[in-house]
Amino acid sequence: MNMDWALFLTFLAACGAPATTGALLKPDEWYDNLNKPWWNPPRWVFPLAWTSLYFLMSLAAMRVAQLEGSGQALAFYAAQLAFNTLWTPVFFGMKRMATALAVVMVMWLFVAATMWAFFQLDTWAGVLFVPYLIWATAATGLNFEAMRLNWNRPEARA
């Protein structure tokens, strides 16, 4: 399969939506004061992980977009990207942990559906999506644990 740079860069640009919300709504004093699980990664891990994931996601989507019958897979891709974009404003902006948990759980379902659909069309595209599903699983767990460990705070139940 050929590397279609225009297509790759288009998908990478689409990752700019969640990247922008992440850059604009960074963890703040509120987040610093939350009780978090012992396995919560240090802050510097997040931009490195997301940069790597956006690259892999874009490469996978580029491969799939070149194939016949990729419409459903790309619809799943767009949906997971939309929920990815939504999570940061809900969690960090609105400080609504329970609502953010619902958002990240739906995102996880679309990430899993995207990975499955990609595997059906192109094995390498599916493989490229595996790290994202692992990261989304960890993110869901972190959101749940932040909510659970801070249940006495009103924003945990919102």
UniProtKB/Swiss-Prot annotation:
Similarity annotation: Belongs to the TspO/BZRP family.
Membrane topology according to the record: Multi-pass membrane protein
Deletion consequences: No effect on chemoheterotrophic growth, and no defects in the production of photosynthetic pigments. When oxygen levels are reduced during chemoheterotrophic growth, mutant cells respond more rapidly than wild-type and display faster accumulation of carotenoids and bacteriochlorophylls.
Gene Ontology CC entries for this record: membrane; plasma membrane
Gene source species: Cereibacter sphaeroides
Alphabetical keyword list: Cell inner membrane, Cell membrane, Lipid-binding, Membrane, Transmembrane, Transmembrane helix, Transport
Subunit-level organization: Homodimer.
GO molecular function terms noted in the UniProt entry: identical protein binding; lipid binding; tetrapyrrole binding
Outcome of swapping residue 38 to C: Decreases growth rate 2-3 fold. Leads to increased levels of the protein and decreased levels of carotenoids and bacteriochlorophylls
Listed Pfam families: TspO_MBR
Domain of life: Bacteria
Membrane as UniProt keyword: yes
Subcellular location: Membrane; Cell inner membrane
GO-annotated biological processes: tetrapyrrole metabolic process
Induction profile: Up-regulated during photosynthetic growth, when compared to aerobic growth in the dark (at protein level).
Described purpose of this protein according to its UniProt entry: May play a role in the transmembrane transport of tetrapyrroles and similar compounds, and thereby contribute to the regulation of tetrapyrrole biosynthesis. Binds tetrapyrroles and promotes the photooxidative degradation of protoporphyrin IX. Binds protoporphyrin IX, hemin, and coproporphyrin III, but does not bind delta-aminolevulinic acid. Can bind bilirubin, curcumin, gossypol, retinoic acid, cholesterol and the benzodiazepine receptor agonist PK-11195 (in vitro). Plays a role in the response to low oxygen levels and in the regulation of the biosynthesis of photosynthetic pigments.
The organism's taxonomic lineage, starting at the top: Bacteria, Pseudomonadati, Pseudomonadota, Alphaproteobacteria, Rhodobacterales
Gene3D superfamilies assigned: TspO/MBR protein
Membrane-spanning intervals of the chain: 5-25, 44-65, 73-93, 97-119, 124-144
UniProt-recorded name of the protein: Tryptophan-rich sensory protein
Effect on the protein of changing residue 15 to S: Leads to decreased levels of the protein and increased levels of carotenoids and bacteriochlorophylls
